[in-house]
């Protein structure tokens, strides 16, 4: 099934995709025919990217029309899901069987395949990005053939095929690591001085299983502490406890936020910031994010504090999180623990552009890598130069997609072919 004359936009509305041909197959065989017959095609996720990573000038395909499946292997501790499944659907199925994922992103509304393709993450000193949970991927190749790559059978290749920006084929299924379900609490501390966080990064971000700092970079922020009930809490207690539930964006009603105030609840109702049944975040917005090496966190705090007067007027809110290193070739956390600096901008590209340039001027010399699905003004060659395995990934694209069916202008700029 296709919509030949409909222009598709992303969730934020800042991107209108270039192709009017958007396919939404209902069966795997239909998807295979669409891919086989298309000259160039890109798969769309849930539309929560803010750039042209998923765009195409030929064909687009949505996978959310395929039957959602979640096949749990209790002994192997994996769940195999169809690519268009959203985390909100997956976590309910897992929890009902007594299992969990190690971590979740801020939004449960996002698709599993799209999140893994771009290196989406949550927070936690011991937690890797969501993509690092992938044990195997099923890829639909340019000729419509299906094949699996796995950690066990293809240990040298799979790390290059997970955070792959859709450039290797259409991911149809993924197998993810799971663990026994657990319970958590969520507490928020407000009035936290940014200088205190900068001086005690390890204490603050080690205070709970998952920790986020929200701020406008003018002097104070709120720290969200998401703690497993089966793990000891850290000692840090800066600021003061919030007097009631809050939203990450100051002044917005707290109802979309997951339950706080230390109430014990299941993992999937505490790890995200937002409830799946309500509108996430601020609505219309722009986003950027940069992964800075953990050892440069203090310098990054100092640099951003120095331009707080520029940042605050352009922001809904900024968020700081931590991510553990992984081995995925194009993961922004490849080979190094990171502190991530996220910016939820007002939906005004002209106002945001000079402020984003000021952020990059300060963070890029610290070794920052941008999020693949968010806004950056970086030169594509500068981005790929920050990845030690970029050349290996380019060779993998040649091997799996020699004709370039799954490429687009975004990947062509990053990995040009002669």
Regions found by a protein language model. Give the residues of each.
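Glycine-rich N-terminal segment of FAD-binding domains in flavoprotein oxidoreductases
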Residues: 13-109, 119-124, 213, 320
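Solvent-exposed alpha-helices and their adjacent loops that cap or buttress functional pockets
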Residues: 14-15, 35, 52-54, 71-74, ...
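Structural signature of FAD isoalloxazine-binding scaffolds in flavoprotein oxidoreductases
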Residues: 51-71, 122-144, 170-177, 339
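Non-transmembrane, aqueous-exposed alpha-helical and coiled segments at domain scale
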Residues: 92-95, 141, 147, 332-334, ...
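C-terminal substrate-binding/cap subdomain adjacent to the FAD-binding core in PCMH-type
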Residues: 135-314, 322
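Substrate-recognition/cap regions that form aromatic- and gly/pro-loop-enriched pockets
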Residues: 271-386
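Activity-critical C-terminal alpha-helical subdomain
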Residues: 366-418
């Amino acid at each position: 099934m296709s919509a030949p004359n409909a222009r598709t936009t992303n969730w934020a509305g800042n991107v209108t995709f270039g192709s009017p041909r958007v396919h939404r197959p209902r069966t795997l065989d239909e998807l295979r025919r669409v891919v086989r017959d298309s000259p160039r095609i890109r798969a769309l996720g849930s539309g929560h990217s803010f750039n042209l990573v998923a765009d195409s000038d030929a064909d687009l395909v949505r996978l959310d029309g395929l039957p959602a499946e979640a096949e749990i292997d209790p002994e192997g501790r994996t769940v195999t899901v169809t690519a268009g499944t959203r985390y909100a659907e997956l976590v309910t199925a897992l929890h009902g069987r007594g299992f969990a994922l190690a971590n979740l992103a801020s939004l449960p509304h996002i698709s599993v395949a799209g999140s893994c393709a771009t290196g989406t993450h949550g927070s936690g000193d011991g937690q890797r990005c969501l993509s690092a949970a992938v044990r195997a991927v099923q890829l639909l190749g340019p000729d419509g053939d299906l094949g699996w790559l796995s950690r066990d059978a293809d240990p040298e290749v799979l790390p290059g095929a997970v955070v792959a920006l859709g450039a290797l084929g259409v991911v149809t299924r993924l197998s993810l690591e799971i663990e026994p379900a657990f319970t958590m609490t969520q507490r928020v501390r407000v009035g936290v001085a940014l200088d205190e966080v900068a001086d005690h990064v390890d204490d603050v971000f080690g205070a709970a299983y998952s920790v986020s700092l929200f701020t406008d970079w003018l002097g104070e922020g709120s720290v969200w502490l998401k703690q497993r009930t089966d793990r000891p809490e850290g000692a840090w207690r800066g600021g003061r406890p919030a007097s009631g539930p809050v939203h990450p964006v100051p002044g917005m009603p707290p109802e979309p936020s997951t339950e706080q105030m230390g109430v014990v609840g299941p993992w999937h109702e505490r790890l995200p910031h937002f409830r799946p049944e309500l509108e996430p975040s601020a609505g219309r917005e722009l986003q950027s994010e940069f992964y800075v090496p953990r050892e440069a966190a203090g310098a990054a705090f100092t640099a951003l504090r120095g331009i707080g007067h520029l940042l605050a007027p352009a922001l809904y809110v900024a968020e700081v999180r931590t991510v553990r290193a992984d081995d995925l070739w194009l993961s922004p956390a490849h080979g190094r623990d990171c502190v991530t600096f996220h910016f939820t901008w007002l939906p005004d590209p002209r106002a945001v552009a000079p402020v984003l340039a000021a952020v990059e001027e300060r963070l890029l010399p610290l070794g920052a890598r941008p999020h693949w699905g968010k806004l950056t003004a970086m030169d594509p060659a500068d981005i790929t130069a920050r990845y030690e395995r970029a050349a290996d990934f380019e060779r993998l694209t040649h091997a799996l997609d020699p004709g370039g069916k799954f490429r687009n202008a975004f990947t062509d700029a990053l990995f040009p072919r002669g």
